[in-house]
Amino acid sequence: MIAAKRIYDPPSSSEGMRVLIMRLWPRGIRKTRVDVWLKELGPVLPLLRAFRGGKLTWPQYTRRYLAGLERPEAQAPLAQVRAAAKDGTVTLFCGCPDETRCHRSLLRAYLLDSPASRRRKSGRAPRRRTARGGAR
């Protein structure tokens, strides 16, 4: 199971493995509050600054953040979260006050909608696309 929560909220025993997904360490948070810091899964700082500065809309930010999860340096941390989620609960943490406009909700949805998750839910492999973009 994969959950998402704000790092400044009080801890709970149901959080399982606590994964911080921010590029910068949050102020006032002790290192003992998280089990793993996977900063590669946080948005790159120029993207975050552009969104917070009003230069990007939420849909633009979403597209760019999700595209960033395809980067080679994000693959090992993504695999680490997926592996931990197979064994129990993983809670993704960041400091954003609004979860509906936060990368932690985007990452959670991305992980839950991964090809492996879709295969488990449907019981079959996803359809492959042809060179023209149609399904086989």
What do these predicted ranges mean?
Residues M1-R136:
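Residues lining hydrophobic/aromatic ligand-binding pockets adjacent to catalytic sites
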